[in-house]
Amino acid sequence: MEFKRCSGILMPISSLPGGYGIGSMGKPARDFVDFLTRAGQTIWQILPVGPTGYADSPYQSCSAFAGNPYFIDLDLLAADGLLTKKDYANINWGGDAAKVDYGTLYEKRFTVLRKAYHNFMRQRPVPGYDTPYSDDWYRFQFLSSDWLPDYCLYMAIKEDNGMVDWQQWPRALRVREPEALARFRAEHAEEIEFWAFLQYEFDRQWRSLHAYAKSKGIAIMGDIPIYVAADSADAWAGRELFETDAEGKPRRVAGCPPDYFAADGQLWGNPLYDWNYHRSTGYAWWICRLRHALSIYDILRIDHFRGFDTYWAIPAGETTARNGRWEQGPRMDLFRALHNALGSLPIVAEDLGEMFDSVRQLLAESGFPGMKVLQFAFTGEDSVDLPHNYPRNCVAYPGTHDNNTLSGWFGEELTPAQRKQVEEYFVLTKQEGIVRGMLRGVQASTAALAIIPMADWLEEPAASRMNTPGMAQGNWQWRADAKKLTPALAKEMRTMAVRYFRHTDK
């Protein structure tokens, strides 16, 4: 696909301002959509919205299909009569409004959501009866039947076993013995239904938000990781999809080879796909996954796109990524199958880092736009990430969720020589401001789409960085201050979008 010339904002749902500890899909999200409209933006890019687990990373979700219950808006539940304000308004959701406290959310949020579930069940319909919920409730379960039952069963068993990794469950449940699963379903029916209720509410609220954004001319760009987490419903219930043994343990895992930045490489630990199996099914699971994603997003960014061409396979049990080897992925065979099943694919390929020629060939053959990141550009050479080298069919960023904020990058990461190069390249002035000058450079580039992290428009310091790769704790916490999303800022953003023909004032 090719974008018309436009601009957008990278803003995670979790980072939206508002009460109750984390951004949500209610008024905070709609207010942000309104802000984007006033600011002349066209696209709202978010991070993956799946349930988070260890280290709170949205890229290590326990499901490739489920939504994060933390994003369910409590005020909307109250408006539906499922909660009262006193159920949640006076709870301490964390001591710092500028950061998400995931520990506090885990301790307190599900207690409130269970109240909503029990109130919902008191109104629980019998199929065929005319109630406010009957049609939607049963329709959602029917339409989600290819993933919802296994996910809810997985979460209920996980909770019953102290939330440990499924590889540590009792063997009968771990290997999915039919009698053991049937017995667990019978004994824990209410708990299984609770997890289904959370997904129902997430789906209702998300689709309402998505429709609202569309009505305001805002397209939502979602994000999916190429791999699923080892501790996930997908790995537990669909072990034939992965390189696993009879016990469901991975034979090989994902990562990256050693390079200049990491002498031991990166050991991610995700189970690798059994691409021969996927090919034998016509890529049915991938078709299901992308059909679901494209039903909730307008555009889809796929993380680690290079893994579809060649991927680094590390023997399970290794403590570093050194002893891995390159293996060939499905390449265009997968994307042809997806196109045949789903039609035009509005995909953005995350193609950052060292790339083989075969990866570039795959990107060119697919026609998907790749990414360019300003913070990678200033090496003293004529980098492909310098704005004057951007092709039209790409997405330009000053930085991504894995980068420092522009303010932090310029002030703390660059050498004096690099700062001088940046200043001269963009002709930076004190009057305009360092960060504003760099944003101008990205917006003025020939890239069809320019995406600016909201933190950079707000000129947030390094402390507001969303993620530092390789650091296990302290990530994914930043939240915006609603007071900074001013009419003056929206006007400034709109003016820049109009100036560089990324928006037209009518």
Residue ranges and their predicted role:
Residues 47, 219-221, 225, 299, ...:
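Outer-envelope exported proteins of Gram-negative bacteria
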Residues 27-34, 204-212, 286-288, 434-438:
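Short alpha-helical segments and helix-capping/turn motifs at coil-helix boundaries
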Residues 8, 12-31:
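N-terminal catalytic cores of NTP/NDP-binding nucleotidyl/phosphoryl-transfer enzymes
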Residues 2, 27-52, 295-297, 442:
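Catalytic domains of carbohydrate-active enzymes, especially glycoside hydrolases
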Residues 37, 206-214, 339, 363-364:
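Surface-exposed amphipathic alpha-helices with a cationic face
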Residues 1-5, 12, 18, 55-203, ...:
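Alpha-amylase-like alpha-glycosidases and glucanotransferases acting on alpha-linked glucans and related
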Residues 195-228:
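Conserved, well-ordered alpha-helix/loop/beta-strand core segments that scaffold catalytic motifs
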